[in-house]
Amino acid sequence: MSPVSQRSLTLIGAGLAGCLLAILLSRRGWQVTVYERRGDPRIKGYESGRSINLALAERGRHALRQAGAEDAVMAKAVMMRGRMVHPLVGQPQLQRYGRDDSEVIWSIHRAALNVALLDLAEQAGARVHFYRRLHTVDFDAGYARFIDDRDDQPHEIHFQSLIGSDGAGSALRAAMQRKSPLGERTEFLDHSYKELEIPPQPGGGFRIEGNALHIWPRGRYMCIALPNDGGTFTVTLFLPNAGEPSFATTRTGDEAFALFARDFPDALPLIPQLKEHWEEHPPGLLGTLTLDRWHLDGRALLIGDAAHAMVPFHGQGMNCAFEDCVALADQLDAHDDLASAFAAFEAARRDDAAAIQQMALENYLEMRDRVDDPDFLLQRELEQQLQARWPTRFVPHYTMVTFLRTRYSIALARSEIQREILVQATRGHSDLSRIDWSALEAVVHARLEPLDGAH
């Protein structure tokens, strides 16, 4: 059993979660060493197969505040007020996320965020070693070997405990699995994604509304664009792997150009390098990872995507991982040995991770199929009215997940009740003029208790 009194931890992965956890633990007096497979992004530029834009919500901002990192990060973020929905015919319409500009989310470039957190981790006292790819682990002897892929040289260390913050393709998870099966399962979507770019205007500034997440919903597929602080947008096309249209039928730049001309005509002139980027950027996979357990007693633990990777459609992967970091730091404070702290962390986070994984999958259907559906828009209108009348009881799904820090599992349970109420109340109606408000009040008060933090 590893006593917390030794206060030494080795992190695998200097990405977003690894750097934030390194800050939190270093500030609490832990000796933290981080090993990263890639080179230092501050020297050689950022390399990642991951999406280069992220949506930062209140959960993530709260974690950054705990680490003293919020100001440095928010200086690089762009506010997004809502979804700007681009129909095939007609003008784009903004669907606000919240009631006003106090309820927004923030777009941030993954590289800028990673560099900011890396700087702060080192300032807090963490030691970060680059070009160290985890190769083998002897959990019984507390020994690990890393390889420098530049020269194939091995580097060996002794450790007290390993924490895997090395993402969905976690090398530590693979090593743990070889030691003792974790019950790993990955369910891939039958959709993949490809990233493109909208450049800034010649004189600088955004070519389209900069304070929104743009969506082109087209039923079985969709395109989105998130703003960057340099005036660019990162465009992501989500497309089926097979069928028409799909990545199987849209292989060349010319085929992509034809797809955009037909289905995203207002986006096409904004992406001058569409053909080149289409052929240069391979499609990315989308999947949900589940494990039966996240730790090997006190010797190793997985957090973030390494433990519970999810599809990106709720913008919560990073926010959830940041919540993991705070929860783990708190459990380490509360327990005298690492095995107990790791077990308590997993028990505290497992149901919430499963809930946001489910909600992320559900949000994909909403984004691609429903944001321009009349029934959905009427339900949204009623949702806003119910929130205005009973703000502590009827709290919209998006508000609970994004603007509050309501536990994901609670947000999921309440959202399912609220969806039933909205569907039942609007069935057969084309507007809200004949809604029975007194009957609705009785239903809301009977089925929804006041929610902590709602206002």
Curated annotation (Swiss-Prot):
Domain of life: Bacteria
InterPro entries, per the entry: FAD-bd, FAD/NAD-bd_sf, Kynurenine_monooxygenase
GO molecular function, one term: FAD binding
Record has 4Fe-4S as a keyword: no
Enzyme class, broadest EC rank: oxidoreductase
Keyword terms of this UniProt record: FAD, Flavoprotein, Monooxygenase, NADP, Oxidoreductase, Pyridine nucleotide biosynthesis
This enzyme's EC code(s): 1.14.13.9
Pathway: Cofactor biosynthesis; NAD(+) biosynthesis; quinolinate from L-kynurenine: step 1/3
Entry's Gene Ontology BP terms: anthranilate metabolic process; kynurenine metabolic process; L-tryptophan catabolic process; NAD biosynthetic process; quinolinate biosynthetic process
Swiss-Prot/TrEMBL catalytic activity: L-kynurenine + NADPH + O2 + H(+) = 3-hydroxy-L-kynurenine + NADP(+) + H2O
Cofactor: FAD
Assigned protein family: Belongs to the aromatic-ring hydroxylase family. KMO subfamily.
Function: Catalyzes the hydroxylation of L-kynurenine (L-Kyn) to form 3-hydroxy-L-kynurenine (L-3OHKyn). Required for synthesis of quinolinic acid.
HAMAP family (alphabetical): Kynurenine_monooxygenase
Name of this chain's protein: Kynurenine 3-monooxygenase
Native organism: Xanthomonas axonopodis pv. citri (strain 306)
Gene behind this protein: kmo
